[in-house]
Swiss-Prot record:
Pfam families: Kunitz_BPTI (PF00014). Has no significant hemolytic activity. One of its GO terms (cellular component) is extracellular space. InterPro entries: Kunitz_BPTI, Kunitz_BPTI_sf, Prtase_inh_Kunz-CS, TFPI/VKTCI-like. Keywords: Blood coagulation cascade inhibiting toxin, Disulfide bond, Hemostasis impairing toxin, Protease inhibitor, Repeat, Secreted, Serine protease inhibitor, Signal, Toxin. It comes from Haemaphysalis doenitzi. This is Doenitin-1. Disulfide bonds join 21-71, 30-54, 46-67, 89-139, 98-122, 114-135. Transmembrane segments: none annotated. Its main location: secreted. Anticoagulant protein that targets host intrinsic blood coagulation pathway. Inhibits host fibrinogen coagulation. Inhibits host thrombin (F2), cathepsin G (CTSG) but not trypsin. May play a role in keeping the blood meal in liquid form in the gut. GO terms for molecular function: serine-type endopeptidase inhibitor activity; toxin activity.
Amino acid sequence: MKLFIFLALFGAAFAQRNGFCRLPAEPGICRAFIPRYYFDVEKGQCEEFIYGGCKGNENNFETLKECKDACTEPEKASDFEKADFETGCKPAPETGHCLASHERWFFNTASGECEAFTYGGCGGNDNNYESKEECEFACKY
């Protein structure tokens, strides 16, 4: 009986904590142009959207990592995908056309290593990885 109560309370707390992940992307009523992330229930992953700067809802994260931490299971190295070398590893990194400042990783063909660069939040190319580990898995091994 104690186990049942514990599981019921744990389940309720988890559902309440992550209930906002089921909300739709809500840009709000203001007119700013702020790249943000929300969890898309239908796709089962975090997606970028443009936030207006006010109102909205709790399914609104400044970084992709914050969204994933709140709404998805932790990634394992096996979740990473190999990249097409010509499009995902060979091009020089592109910061994109937005003005955010996200640390990302790209594969440098000259050094044969994954290196950090600053990503603006939208646009760019496929040589753009969220972690050094993901970049290395995609391009080095």
